[in-house]
């Protein structure tokens, strides 16, 4: 069962690319926290893909991966705003966010670090994630790296996925400024619920037996 995984960090355009692929007819989950959500979706973006891409690569062989880049001077302040808003809900014991999302953010951003919101810390997290992605996919043809703000980036994505695209198409610009929930407000029949329940109810994957 092959998938398309969007493994860029939050605030790099994960919502915009998710909406663009929805409009192409894909079933898309922007965040997925159950096995069934992954089974239903053709495309999965954001958490936990940006932290779990190695495990997902093993669970879904022959899938494609898209890493999203963003100019650091724009990404850092955007991420600072996001983490400021999310922080109370990411707390291990009292935060109400899904445990998979909490783990994904903790693993990537070291939420307990006293310097969490500083430019230096976030830049270091960005660089570490980028380097790890580049190292893991080195020499492989199943990873595409794009900056969705760059001209022609949508055409590059469609070519990578084997889709037709005209030169006048562009990525939608969503979640700009302080907005963080445009995905919830976007109505589309192909959206997949992040908490979709199947035969295993709302169980997530067990990574313990994977050779990582």
Which positions does each model-derived feature cover?
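PAPS-dependent sulfotransferase catalytic domain
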Residues: 1-122, 132, 138-139, 152-163
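Short, contiguous clusters of charged residues that form electrostatic/catalytic patches at enzyme active sites
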Residues: 51, 127-131, 155
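A short, terminal or domain-edge coil/loop segment
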Residues: 84-92, 125, 129-132, 197-210
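PAPS-dependent sulfotransferase catalytic core
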Residues: 47, 106-109, 165-212
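Short beta->alpha linker loops
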Residues: 48, 70, 128, 148-152
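C-terminal/domain-terminus segments
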Residues: 143-179
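Active-site oxyanion/phosphate-handling segment shared across diverse enzymes
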Residues: 119-148
């Amino acid at each position: 069962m092959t998938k398309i995984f969007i493994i860029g960090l939050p605030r790099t355009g994960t919502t915009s690319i998710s909406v663009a692929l929805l409009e192409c007819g894909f079933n898309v989950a922007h965040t997925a926290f159950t096995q069934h959500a992954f089974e239903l979706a053709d495309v999965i973006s954001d958490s936990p893909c940006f932290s779990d891409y190695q495990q997902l690569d093993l669970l879904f062989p022959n899938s494609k991966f898209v890493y999203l880049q963003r100019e650091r001077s724009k990404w850092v302040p955007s991420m600072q705003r996001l983490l400021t808003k999310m922080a109370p809900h990411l707390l291990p014991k009292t935060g109400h966010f899904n445990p998979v999302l909490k783990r994904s953010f903790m693993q990537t951003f070291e939420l307990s670090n006293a310097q969490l919101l500083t430019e230096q810390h976030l830049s270091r997290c960005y660089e570490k994630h980028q380097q790890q992605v580049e190292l893991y996919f080195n020499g492989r043809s199943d990873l595409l790296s794009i900056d969705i703000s760059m001209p022609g980036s949508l055409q590059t994505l469609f070519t990578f996925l084997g889709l037709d695209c005209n030169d006048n198409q562009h990525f939608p610009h969503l979640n700009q400024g302080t907005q963080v929930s445009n995905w919830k407000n976007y109505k589309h029949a192909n959206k997949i619920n992040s908490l979709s329940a199947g035969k295993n109810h709302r169980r997530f994957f067990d990574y313990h037996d994977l050779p990582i």
